[in-house]
Amino acid sequence: MPAEPIPTPAPASRPPGSTASAARMPLAVYILGLSVFALGTSEFMLTGLLPDIADDMNVSIPQAGLLISAFAIGMVVGAPLLAVATLRLPRRTTLIALITVFGLGQIAGALAPNYALLFASRIVSALACAGFWAVGAAVAIAMVPVNARARAMAVMIGGLSIANVLGVPLGALLGDGLGWRSAFWAVGAASAIALVGILTRIPRIPLPAEKPRLGRELRIYRDPQVLLSVAVTALAAGGVFCAFSYLKPLLTDVAHVDAGWVPAVLGLFGVGALIGTTIGGRVADAHLFGVLLSGITASTVFLVALALFASTPAIAITLSFLIGLSAFYTAPALNARMFNVGGAAPTLAGATTTSSFNLGNTAGPWLGGLVISANLGFAATAWAGAAMTVVALALVTVSLRLHKSQSRVVARSADQISADQAHAASPAEVCP
Protein backbone atom coordinates (compact mmCIF):
# COMPACT_ATOMS: atom_id res chain seq x y z
CA MET A 1 0.00 0.00 0.00
CA PRO A 2 1.53 3.37 -0.93
CA ALA A 3 2.47 5.80 1.77
CA GLU A 4 0.29 8.86 2.23
CA PRO A 5 1.58 12.11 0.76
CA ILE A 6 2.72 14.75 3.19
CA PRO A 7 -0.06 17.27 3.79
CA THR A 8 0.86 20.83 2.86
CA PRO A 9 1.14 22.84 6.08
CA ALA A 10 -1.32 25.70 6.39
CA PRO A 11 0.02 29.20 6.84
CA ALA A 12 0.91 29.95 10.43
CA SER A 13 -1.09 33.17 10.30
CA ARG A 14 -4.47 31.50 10.04
CA PRO A 15 -6.53 31.78 13.20
CA PRO A 16 -7.17 28.70 15.32
CA GLY A 17 -10.77 28.60 14.31
CA SER A 18 -10.01 28.45 10.62
CA THR A 19 -10.61 25.54 8.29
CA ALA A 20 -6.97 24.55 8.44
CA SER A 21 -7.11 24.36 12.18
CA ALA A 22 -10.25 22.26 12.12
CA ALA A 23 -8.88 19.87 9.49
CA ARG A 24 -8.71 16.20 10.33
CA MET A 25 -5.44 14.78 11.54
CA PRO A 26 -3.52 12.71 8.96
CA LEU A 27 -3.90 8.97 9.49
CA ALA A 28 -0.12 8.78 9.90
CA VAL A 29 -0.35 10.75 13.15
CA TYR A 30 -2.76 8.13 14.54
CA ILE A 31 -0.32 5.40 13.51
CA LEU A 32 2.28 7.16 15.64
CA GLY A 33 -0.25 7.22 18.49
CA LEU A 34 -0.73 3.46 18.12
CA SER A 35 3.02 3.01 18.31
CA VAL A 36 3.15 5.10 21.48
CA PHE A 37 0.46 2.82 22.97
CA ALA A 38 2.90 -0.10 22.66
CA LEU A 39 5.77 1.99 24.04
CA GLY A 40 3.73 3.26 26.98
CA THR A 41 2.35 -0.15 27.88
CA SER A 42 5.87 -1.55 28.09
CA GLU A 43 7.07 1.40 30.15
CA PHE A 44 4.35 1.23 32.81
CA MET A 45 3.20 -2.41 32.86
CA LEU A 46 5.94 -3.54 35.24
CA THR A 47 4.08 -1.85 38.10
CA GLY A 48 1.63 -4.77 38.15
CA LEU A 49 4.24 -7.44 37.34
CA LEU A 50 7.01 -6.77 39.86
CA PRO A 51 6.07 -9.45 42.45
CA ASP A 52 5.87 -12.15 39.76
CA ILE A 53 9.16 -11.06 38.16
CA ALA A 54 10.89 -10.94 41.55
CA ASP A 55 9.68 -14.44 42.41
CA ASP A 56 10.63 -15.91 39.02
CA MET A 57 14.07 -14.25 38.92
CA ASN A 58 14.84 -14.89 42.61
CA VAL A 59 15.39 -11.21 43.42
CA SER A 60 13.74 -8.84 45.89
CA ILE A 61 10.84 -6.61 44.87
CA PRO A 62 12.98 -3.45 45.29
CA GLN A 63 15.62 -5.03 43.04
CA ALA A 64 12.95 -5.86 40.49
CA GLY A 65 11.80 -2.25 40.80
CA LEU A 66 15.16 -1.17 39.40
CA LEU A 67 13.85 -2.39 36.04
CA ILE A 68 11.47 0.59 36.10
CA SER A 69 14.26 3.00 37.03
CA ALA A 70 16.49 1.56 34.29
CA PHE A 71 13.80 2.24 31.69
CA ALA A 72 13.29 5.82 32.87
CA ILE A 73 17.01 6.59 32.92
CA GLY A 74 17.38 5.00 29.48
CA MET A 75 14.68 7.37 28.23
CA VAL A 76 16.41 10.42 29.71
CA VAL A 77 19.77 9.53 28.19
CA GLY A 78 18.57 7.87 25.00
CA ALA A 79 16.37 10.64 23.62
CA PRO A 80 19.09 13.24 22.97
CA LEU A 81 21.74 10.65 22.07
CA LEU A 82 19.61 8.98 19.41
CA ALA A 83 18.30 12.31 18.18
CA VAL A 84 21.88 13.37 17.49
CA ALA A 85 22.90 9.97 16.07
CA THR A 86 19.99 9.90 13.61
CA LEU A 87 19.99 13.60 12.76
CA ARG A 88 20.93 13.08 9.09
CA LEU A 89 19.01 9.84 8.54
CA PRO A 90 15.60 9.65 6.80
CA ARG A 91 12.85 10.03 9.42
CA ARG A 92 10.70 7.14 8.17
CA THR A 93 13.66 4.75 8.03
CA THR A 94 14.65 5.77 11.55
CA LEU A 95 11.14 5.09 12.88
CA ILE A 96 11.11 1.65 11.24
CA ALA A 97 14.48 0.77 12.77
CA LEU A 98 13.54 2.00 16.25
CA ILE A 99 10.15 0.24 16.48
CA THR A 100 11.83 -2.95 15.24
CA VAL A 101 14.54 -2.76 17.91
CA PHE A 102 11.89 -1.98 20.52
CA GLY A 103 9.83 -5.03 19.52
CA LEU A 104 12.90 -7.26 19.60
CA GLY A 105 13.63 -5.89 23.07
CA GLN A 106 10.21 -7.11 24.23
CA ILE A 107 10.89 -10.57 22.80
CA ALA A 108 14.29 -10.62 24.51
CA GLY A 109 12.60 -9.72 27.79
CA ALA A 110 10.04 -12.49 27.36
CA LEU A 111 12.82 -15.03 26.76
CA ALA A 112 15.29 -13.69 29.37
CA PRO A 113 16.61 -16.60 31.48
CA ASN A 114 17.94 -14.36 34.25
CA TYR A 115 17.67 -10.92 35.81
CA ALA A 116 20.79 -9.51 34.13
CA LEU A 117 19.50 -10.20 30.61
CA LEU A 118 16.05 -8.89 31.51
CA PHE A 119 17.70 -5.71 32.83
CA ALA A 120 19.70 -5.36 29.61
CA SER A 121 16.56 -5.84 27.50
CA ARG A 122 14.85 -3.02 29.39
CA ILE A 123 17.73 -0.64 28.70
CA VAL A 124 17.71 -1.50 24.98
CA SER A 125 13.93 -1.07 24.86
CA ALA A 126 14.17 2.28 26.66
CA LEU A 127 16.78 3.61 24.24
CA ALA A 128 14.63 2.63 21.24
CA CYS A 129 11.52 4.04 22.94
CA ALA A 130 13.25 7.36 23.63
CA GLY A 131 14.49 7.66 20.07
CA PHE A 132 11.04 6.83 18.67
CA TRP A 133 9.39 9.49 20.83
CA ALA A 134 11.88 12.13 19.70
CA VAL A 135 11.73 11.34 15.98
CA GLY A 136 8.02 10.49 15.99
CA ALA A 137 7.13 13.82 17.58
CA ALA A 138 9.15 15.68 14.95
CA VAL A 139 7.41 13.71 12.18
CA ALA A 140 3.96 14.41 13.63
CA ILE A 141 4.73 18.12 13.88
CA ALA A 142 5.99 18.16 10.27
CA MET A 143 2.70 16.75 8.96
CA VAL A 144 0.35 19.38 10.40
CA PRO A 145 -0.05 23.18 10.33
CA VAL A 146 1.70 25.19 13.02
CA ASN A 147 -1.65 25.94 14.67
CA ALA A 148 -2.42 22.21 15.00
CA ARG A 149 0.78 21.13 16.75
CA ALA A 150 -0.81 20.62 20.15
CA ARG A 151 -3.58 18.51 18.59
CA ALA A 152 -1.01 16.32 16.85
CA MET A 153 0.90 15.87 20.10
CA ALA A 154 -2.38 15.11 21.87
CA VAL A 155 -2.89 12.17 19.51
CA MET A 156 0.55 10.80 20.37
CA ILE A 157 0.11 11.41 24.10
CA GLY A 158 -3.34 9.87 23.78
CA GLY A 159 -1.59 6.61 22.94
CA LEU A 160 0.19 6.90 26.29
CA SER A 161 -3.09 7.64 28.07
CA ILE A 162 -4.78 4.61 26.50
CA ALA A 163 -1.78 2.53 27.59
CA ASN A 164 -2.57 3.56 31.17
CA VAL A 165 -6.29 2.83 30.76
CA LEU A 166 -6.09 -0.45 28.82
CA GLY A 167 -2.52 -1.62 28.27
CA VAL A 168 -1.32 -1.68 31.87
CA PRO A 169 -4.43 -3.44 33.31
CA LEU A 170 -4.40 -5.95 30.43
CA GLY A 171 -0.71 -6.58 31.10
CA ALA A 172 -1.54 -7.27 34.74
CA LEU A 173 -4.35 -9.65 33.74
CA LEU A 174 -2.05 -11.51 31.35
CA GLY A 175 0.58 -11.69 34.06
CA ASP A 176 -1.89 -13.17 36.54
CA GLY A 177 -3.33 -15.67 34.08
CA LEU A 178 -0.43 -16.69 31.85
CA GLY A 179 2.67 -15.42 33.63
CA TRP A 180 4.56 -12.13 33.38
CA ARG A 181 6.36 -13.16 30.19
CA SER A 182 3.06 -13.21 28.30
CA ALA A 183 2.73 -9.45 28.82
CA PHE A 184 6.07 -8.94 27.07
CA TRP A 185 4.94 -11.15 24.17
CA ALA A 186 1.74 -9.08 23.88
CA VAL A 187 3.68 -5.81 23.66
CA GLY A 188 5.95 -7.42 21.07
CA ALA A 189 2.85 -8.25 19.00
CA ALA A 190 1.56 -4.67 19.37
CA SER A 191 4.95 -3.43 18.18
CA ALA A 192 4.67 -5.62 15.08
CA ILE A 193 1.26 -4.11 14.28
CA ALA A 194 2.73 -0.62 14.72
CA LEU A 195 5.59 -1.55 12.38
CA VAL A 196 3.12 -2.53 9.66
CA GLY A 197 1.32 0.78 10.11
CA ILE A 198 4.56 2.74 9.80
CA LEU A 199 5.60 0.81 6.69
CA THR A 200 2.28 1.43 4.95
CA ARG A 201 1.11 4.82 6.20
CA ILE A 202 4.01 7.00 7.31
CA PRO A 203 5.11 9.19 4.38
CA ARG A 204 8.68 9.62 3.24
CA ILE A 205 9.69 13.00 4.60
CA PRO A 206 12.47 14.52 2.47
CA LEU A 207 15.58 15.67 4.26
CA PRO A 208 16.22 19.43 4.19
CA ALA A 209 18.29 20.73 1.28
CA GLU A 210 20.98 21.76 3.74
CA LYS A 211 22.14 18.89 5.94
CA PRO A 212 21.49 19.49 9.65
CA ARG A 213 24.55 20.53 11.60
CA LEU A 214 24.87 19.42 15.21
CA GLY A 215 26.43 22.69 16.33
CA ARG A 216 23.56 24.66 14.86
CA GLU A 217 20.96 22.35 16.40
CA LEU A 218 22.57 22.60 19.84
CA ARG A 219 22.20 26.38 19.76
CA ILE A 220 18.61 26.03 20.92
CA TYR A 221 19.96 25.37 24.41
CA ARG A 222 21.23 28.96 24.53
CA ASP A 223 17.63 30.16 24.52
CA PRO A 224 16.34 30.82 28.08
CA GLN A 225 12.85 29.85 26.93
CA VAL A 226 14.08 26.36 25.99
CA LEU A 227 15.67 25.92 29.42
CA LEU A 228 12.51 27.20 31.10
CA SER A 229 10.45 24.73 29.08
CA VAL A 230 12.72 21.88 30.20
CA ALA A 231 12.40 22.87 33.86
CA VAL A 232 8.62 23.36 33.72
CA THR A 233 8.08 19.99 32.03
CA ALA A 234 10.31 18.10 34.47
CA LEU A 235 8.79 19.75 37.55
CA ALA A 236 5.18 19.39 36.39
CA ALA A 237 5.66 15.70 35.59
CA GLY A 238 7.78 15.07 38.67
CA GLY A 239 5.23 16.63 41.00
CA VAL A 240 2.46 14.36 39.79
CA PHE A 241 4.53 11.17 39.75
CA CYS A 242 5.99 11.95 43.17
CA ALA A 243 2.56 11.09 44.55
CA PHE A 244 1.21 8.77 41.83
CA SER A 245 4.13 6.33 42.14
CA TYR A 246 3.04 5.60 45.72
CA LEU A 247 -0.70 5.76 45.12
CA LYS A 248 -1.22 2.05 45.79
CA PRO A 249 0.15 2.06 49.37
CA LEU A 250 -1.55 5.41 49.98
CA LEU A 251 -4.89 3.90 49.00
CA THR A 252 -4.46 0.68 50.97
CA ASP A 253 -2.61 1.94 54.06
CA VAL A 254 -3.97 5.48 54.46
CA ALA A 255 -7.39 5.48 52.78
CA HIS A 256 -7.94 1.78 53.66
CA VAL A 257 -9.23 0.94 50.21
CA ASP A 258 -9.39 -2.81 49.57
CA ALA A 259 -6.39 -3.95 47.52
CA GLY A 260 -8.72 -5.52 44.96
CA TRP A 261 -9.98 -2.06 44.00
CA VAL A 262 -6.55 -0.55 43.41
CA PRO A 263 -6.34 -1.57 39.70
CA ALA A 264 -9.70 0.10 39.10
CA VAL A 265 -8.49 3.31 40.75
CA LEU A 266 -5.32 3.24 38.65
CA GLY A 267 -7.55 2.77 35.60
CA LEU A 268 -9.56 5.78 36.75
CA PHE A 269 -6.34 7.82 36.72
CA GLY A 270 -5.85 6.63 33.14
CA VAL A 271 -9.38 7.66 32.16
CA GLY A 272 -8.71 11.11 33.59
CA ALA A 273 -5.46 11.22 31.64
CA LEU A 274 -7.24 10.35 28.39
CA ILE A 275 -9.92 13.01 28.93
CA GLY A 276 -7.32 15.58 29.92
CA THR A 277 -5.21 14.87 26.84
CA THR A 278 -8.24 15.23 24.56
CA ILE A 279 -9.36 18.54 26.05
CA GLY A 280 -5.86 19.96 26.38
CA GLY A 281 -4.99 19.08 22.80
CA ARG A 282 -8.04 20.90 21.49
CA VAL A 283 -7.49 24.18 23.34
CA ALA A 284 -3.70 24.41 23.74
CA ASP A 285 -3.02 25.63 20.20
CA ALA A 286 -5.11 28.74 20.81
CA HIS A 287 -4.43 29.23 24.54
CA LEU A 288 -1.07 27.60 25.26
CA PHE A 289 -0.08 29.59 28.34
CA GLY A 290 -3.66 29.52 29.61
CA VAL A 291 -3.59 25.72 29.52
CA LEU A 292 -0.23 25.60 31.29
CA LEU A 293 -1.26 28.00 34.04
CA SER A 294 -4.69 26.48 34.66
CA GLY A 295 -3.53 22.87 34.37
CA ILE A 296 -0.52 23.13 36.68
CA THR A 297 -2.55 25.18 39.16
CA ALA A 298 -5.22 22.47 39.16
CA SER A 299 -2.59 19.76 39.73
CA THR A 300 -1.23 21.72 42.69
CA VAL A 301 -4.68 22.11 44.24
CA PHE A 302 -5.51 18.42 43.73
CA LEU A 303 -2.20 17.29 45.24
CA VAL A 304 -2.71 19.49 48.30
CA ALA A 305 -6.25 18.12 48.66
CA LEU A 306 -4.89 14.56 48.43
CA ALA A 307 -2.38 15.30 51.18
CA LEU A 308 -5.13 16.73 53.40
CA PHE A 309 -7.86 14.15 52.73
CA ALA A 310 -5.90 10.98 51.92
CA SER A 311 -7.62 9.10 54.73
CA THR A 312 -11.07 9.59 53.17
CA PRO A 313 -11.55 6.84 50.53
CA ALA A 314 -14.13 8.61 48.33
CA ILE A 315 -12.07 11.81 48.17
CA ALA A 316 -8.79 9.97 47.54
CA ILE A 317 -10.35 7.99 44.68
CA THR A 318 -11.94 11.09 43.13
CA LEU A 319 -8.65 12.97 43.34
CA SER A 320 -6.86 10.11 41.59
CA PHE A 321 -9.08 10.76 38.57
CA LEU A 322 -8.68 14.54 38.79
CA ILE A 323 -4.89 14.41 39.09
CA GLY A 324 -4.72 12.24 35.97
CA LEU A 325 -6.95 14.72 34.15
CA SER A 326 -5.02 17.85 35.14
CA ALA A 327 -1.58 16.32 34.56
CA PHE A 328 -2.31 15.13 31.03
CA TYR A 329 -4.37 18.24 30.23
CA THR A 330 -1.08 20.16 30.24
CA ALA A 331 0.96 17.54 28.35
CA PRO A 332 0.08 18.67 24.78
CA ALA A 333 0.84 22.28 25.71
CA LEU A 334 4.19 21.33 27.25
CA ASN A 335 5.15 19.49 24.06
CA ALA A 336 3.92 22.25 21.75
CA ARG A 337 5.73 24.91 23.76
CA MET A 338 9.05 23.14 23.33
CA PHE A 339 8.53 22.87 19.56
CA ASN A 340 7.59 26.55 19.42
CA VAL A 341 10.75 27.76 21.17
CA GLY A 342 13.04 25.07 19.75
CA GLY A 343 11.62 24.97 16.25
CA ALA A 344 15.04 25.49 14.68
CA ALA A 345 15.93 21.95 15.81
CA PRO A 346 12.68 19.92 15.76
CA THR A 347 14.27 16.52 16.41
CA LEU A 348 16.30 17.79 19.34
CA ALA A 349 13.20 19.62 20.59
CA GLY A 350 11.29 16.34 20.64
CA ALA A 351 14.21 14.59 22.31
CA THR A 352 14.48 17.32 24.92
CA THR A 353 10.79 17.07 25.75
CA THR A 354 11.06 13.28 26.12
CA SER A 355 14.08 13.64 28.40
CA SER A 356 12.35 16.35 30.43
CA PHE A 357 9.25 14.26 31.09
CA ASN A 358 11.33 11.25 32.09
CA LEU A 359 13.63 13.36 34.23
CA GLY A 360 10.52 14.32 36.15
CA ASN A 361 9.33 10.70 36.19
CA THR A 362 12.68 9.76 37.76
CA ALA A 363 13.11 12.68 40.17
CA GLY A 364 9.51 12.68 41.42
CA PRO A 365 9.43 9.07 42.68
CA TRP A 366 12.94 9.54 44.09
CA LEU A 367 11.78 12.56 46.12
CA GLY A 368 8.70 10.64 47.21
CA GLY A 369 10.92 7.79 48.36
CA LEU A 370 12.98 10.20 50.47
CA VAL A 371 9.80 11.50 52.08
CA ILE A 372 8.65 7.98 52.92
CA SER A 373 12.10 6.99 54.21
CA ALA A 374 11.94 10.01 56.53
CA ASN A 375 8.82 8.42 58.09
CA LEU A 376 6.59 11.30 56.99
CA GLY A 377 3.97 8.94 55.59
CA PHE A 378 2.58 8.17 52.16
CA ALA A 379 0.30 11.21 52.16
CA ALA A 380 3.36 13.46 52.47
CA THR A 381 4.38 12.49 48.93
CA ALA A 382 1.48 14.64 47.74
CA TRP A 383 2.86 17.62 49.69
CA ALA A 384 6.26 17.10 48.07
CA GLY A 385 4.62 16.81 44.65
CA ALA A 386 2.67 20.02 45.22
CA ALA A 387 5.92 21.81 46.09
CA MET A 388 7.36 20.76 42.72
CA THR A 389 4.30 21.94 40.78
CA VAL A 390 4.35 25.30 42.60
CA VAL A 391 7.89 25.87 41.33
CA ALA A 392 6.76 24.80 37.84
CA LEU A 393 3.92 27.32 38.03
CA ALA A 394 6.32 30.10 38.99
CA LEU A 395 8.57 29.27 36.03
CA VAL A 396 5.59 29.33 33.64
CA THR A 397 4.89 32.87 34.86
CA VAL A 398 8.51 33.84 34.18
CA SER A 399 8.30 32.29 30.71
CA LEU A 400 5.07 34.16 29.96
CA ARG A 401 6.57 37.51 30.96
CA LEU A 402 9.64 36.84 28.82
CA HIS A 403 7.39 35.81 25.91
CA LYS A 404 5.38 39.04 26.16
CA SER A 405 8.56 41.10 26.37
CA GLN A 406 10.02 39.43 23.27
CA SER A 407 6.72 39.85 21.40
CA ARG A 408 6.72 43.59 22.10
CA VAL A 409 10.29 43.90 20.80
CA VAL A 410 9.39 42.02 17.61
CA ALA A 411 6.27 44.17 17.12
CA ARG A 412 8.25 47.40 17.53
CA SER A 413 10.89 46.16 15.08
CA ALA A 414 8.21 45.28 12.52
CA ASP A 415 6.60 48.72 12.91
CA GLN A 416 9.96 50.42 12.45
CA ILE A 417 10.72 48.41 9.31
CA SER A 418 7.29 49.26 7.86
CA ALA A 419 7.82 52.95 8.61
CA ASP A 420 11.26 52.93 6.99
CA GLN A 421 9.90 51.19 3.90
CA ALA A 422 7.05 53.68 3.61
CA HIS A 423 9.45 56.59 3.96
CA ALA A 424 11.77 55.14 1.29
CA ALA A 425 8.86 54.61 -1.10
CA SER A 426 7.50 58.18 -0.77
CA PRO A 427 8.58 60.77 -3.42
CA ALA A 428 11.43 63.02 -2.41
CA GLU A 429 10.48 66.52 -1.35
CA VAL A 430 11.29 69.22 -3.93
CA CYS A 431 12.25 72.67 -2.71
CA PRO A 432 10.44 75.56 -4.46
Regions found by a protein language model. Give the residues of each.
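Helix-loop-helix hairpin linking two adjacent transmembrane segments in secondary transporters
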Residues: 113-117, 132, 145-203, 250
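C-terminal transmembrane helical hairpin of 12-TM major facilitator-type secondary transporters
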Residues: 290-334
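Conserved MFS/SLC helix-loop-helix module at the cytosolic interface between two early adjacent transmembrane helices
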Residues: 77-116
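Juxtamembrane intracellular "pre-TM" segments in multi-pass secondary transporters
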Residues: 14-22, 201-230
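Helix-breaking motifs and short loop linkers at transmembrane-helix boundaries and internal kinks
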Residues: 58, 90, 111-117, 128, ...
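A late C-terminal transmembrane helix in Major Facilitator Superfamily
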Residues: 341-377, 385
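Paired small-residue
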Residues: 101, 105-108, 116-125, 314-322
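Helix-to-loop junctions at the C-terminal end of transmembrane segments
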Residues: 79-91, 276-288, 372
